[in-house]
Each structure stands twice: as C-alpha cells, then as structure tokens.
Amino acid sequence: VHGSRGLGDVYKRQGDFIHALMESIHDELDKEIDPMSREGISQYSLRGNLDAAVRVSNACLADQHVIDALSVRLMKPLEDETGWDVFSLEYKLRAPLTTIFSDREMGRYSRAFTFLWKLKRAEYTLCELWKAMKPTVSSRFQREGLGGNIGKALEVEQARCHRVRQSMHALISDVQYYVMFEVLEPSWNEFECKLSHNAANDDLDSIIAGHENYLNSVIEKALLGTKSQVLQRSLQLIFDSVQKFKSHTFKLYEAIEDASRVRKSDQRRIVEREMNQQWGVDFGESKEGEDYLSEDFVTGAKESLDSIENEFQKHVDGFLKLLPLQTHVDTSFLSFRLEATFRQGA
C-alpha cells in the first residue's frame, strides 16, 4: 500500500523531487531516439540523474526500501519521439506486494504516471519560459537592444508571448489542482480510511478489492478511462501546443539577444572611431539598431505566434466543450475555473 501513496507523495506541489529530477534530466530527454536501436538516450545516465535528484530533494527523507525500489524505465519509442515520450519512473516490487500489485495494476499506475509526468513537464516548460521572458530580460532588451520600428514590433511580440504563456500556465495549473486535490488526495484518503477501519477484519481479498477500487477511482477521475479517451487526446494537443510555444519563444529571444549583442559590439566600435576622429557609422551599421533583424524575421515570428495562439485556443475550446460531457465523474469545479479564465473575455 505504501507504493500507492508514493504516487501522490512524488507528485504533490510541496515536494521538490520532480522539479529536481527534471532539472537534471531535461538535456538527456530532449534527445531524439532511434526507434530501431533505441540509441540517443542513456538509461545509465538517467539512473544517475534519478539518484542525484533523490539526494538533493525531500525524496531522501523517504524510507530506504522505497528509494531502493525506485528505478527508470524506457518505453518502446515511436518515430520522431524524444526521451520525454518514453521516460517513466518504475517502482520495482517484491513479494508479497506483487500479490496486490499485479502486472495489470502496475500498468495502470504507469498510465497515471505518464499523464502526471506530461502535466509536470508542461508546468516545468512554462516556468523555464518565464525565466527567459521575465521583465528584467525584456527591459534589458529595450535598454540595450533594437530601435526603430523593428524594435517596437519586437516589444509587441514579447508582450504577446507573456500573454500566451500566462494563458497556458493558467490552464495547466487548474488541471493540476483538479488532479491533485480532487482526484489523488481524496481517493487515497478514502482508501486509507477503509483500511484503517477494517484492519482487524480485512482478509487479503478485501484488501485487493479495496486497492482495485482506489485505482479505478484515480483512473476514471483523472480522465484516463475508456470513457474519456477523446478528452485525453484533446488535452494531449494542449500539451503539444505548450512545446511548440517553447520552441518558438526560445528561438525568438535567442535571435533578439544575438542581435542585441552584435549591436552593442558595433556601438563600441562606433564610439572608438569617433574618439579617433573617424566616421562613427560604417556601411551596414545603425545607431538605432534597426538593421540587425529583418522585417521578414519579425513578420515570420508574428505569424508563427498567431498560429500557435490560435491552435492553443482551438484546443482549449474543444476541451471545454468535452469536459461537461464526462458525466461519469464530477468535473464541475474544474469546468467552472476554466470557464471563468477562458470565457470571461469571450
């Protein structure tokens, strides 16, 4: 039963294990994998990163037998998949726990972990984007960066990036809150309460049945059951939009920073020439910094963000339409929060 509790303990917000793990393995998981040879990602390196994440996080306070049972598993990759798509944590069980945790149950735990992992990856991605986009970075670009019409257009695109990131973060946070506080914790508390009340009279069969009911509750309420497959695909499209936004934003900010760096170098040369009584501005240089990024680049960046923003909103609209149809579970509070966030301006 302690293995079941680990699902929530590892995932809960106040824990730092998942964040420490993602910090240490994101470079490895960004690599593409050959579907035939599985080359491109090292399970040995991932295992070392897992051990390091345990040591530097609150996971080190867990019982030693729990830490020893935690391992890394790589699922079979498909075409164009990266390490993020095949990585999974594995809890290796020994008898007599295997009596309760059969291969079927462990497969369902794996499905739940994969979903939670995708949620946490989306949250981690959006937090990393905030570090790249935070106001101090934007103000530095404005102070040292590009002038003229191109500079103004880039400021508009930076502001739009902040708005899109905020919308994505709001949705991911609401879904995480639902999974944590309306699915995992109440399902576990109910299971634990039944075990403690019937501890003296329960036989093995009743424990197995209680655990199966608990797992059924988690799978269904987390929208991972057969009745929620369409909704789950809709949520996966939202996850994909987050990763597309990450790629777009990092490319945009890297280009702006590179242009800013070149401009600063040119500005130093201009000052040196003027001090030596030479022409300050040479061919291809601009004191306003208008020529370091082309209008085509700015137009392309705007069109790319338009596409990502429209795609994300389309997927959110689809998700909101499907959510009330999940009559087998109570998603009313999640629907209310999302409607308040995404429909108030409609």
PLM features per residue range, with description:
Residues 9, 100-129, 155-203:
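Extended amphipathic alpha-helical scaffold segments
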Residues 130-141, 184-192, 236-237, 256-271:
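Amphipathic alpha-helical scaffolding segments
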Residues 2-7, 11:
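Single conserved hydrophobic/aromatic residue that forms the stacking wall/gate
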Residues 54, 74-78, 88, 95-107, ...:
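Extended amphipathic alpha-helical elements
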Residues 137-152, 157:
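Long, K/E/R/D-enriched contiguous segments that form extended
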